[in-house]
Amino acid sequence: MTAILVTGYRSFELGIFSEKDKRVAIIKKAIERDLIAYLEEGVDWFIFTGNLGFEQWALEVANDLKKTYPLKTATIFAFETHGSTWNDRNQQQLQQFRETDFVKYSYPSYESPKQLKSYHHFLIHNTDGAYLFYDSEHETRLSYLVAAMKEQPCYPLSFLNFERLNDIADE
């Protein structure tokens, strides 16, 4: 079994507030290419943390690829309360993560920063690498997870970046 953690920018961090935004189609095209490459290398699980934006689009692509490839998806939420204060539209989108092949919560609710560090440790030590849409020049709170990943020897990271998206848009 090979599992890849999939994470990246949330939609609002990219200034995307509608699924009809043309950038979403470009991002999904890149995701599809990358997930197919992973599948052809033998990856059989894609692991998500339940964030809207890149993860949501990757989950949608993965679900489409299930028609052709034998793959599984999992969501490991940091907290059982994840998304509980979101509006109805976002709650509906979050439901996709709750319907993956495997769903678990690390903690009932947030109590301290130590929980997030432990959660990151768990994600890294229970996956075989990560696929990220992240650029260190445009930092978000994802930087903590990326830093923890980079500290691990033999933990491969594959980045989708803005330059590659521009190339795909120009095709």
Curated annotation (Swiss-Prot):
Q: Which cysteines are joined by disulfide bonds?
A: none
Q: Which InterPro entries match?
A: YspA
State the SUPFAM superfamilies in the record: MCP/YpsA-like (SSF102405)
Record-stated family = Belongs to the UPF0398 family.
The entry's protein name is UPF0398 protein SEQ_1788
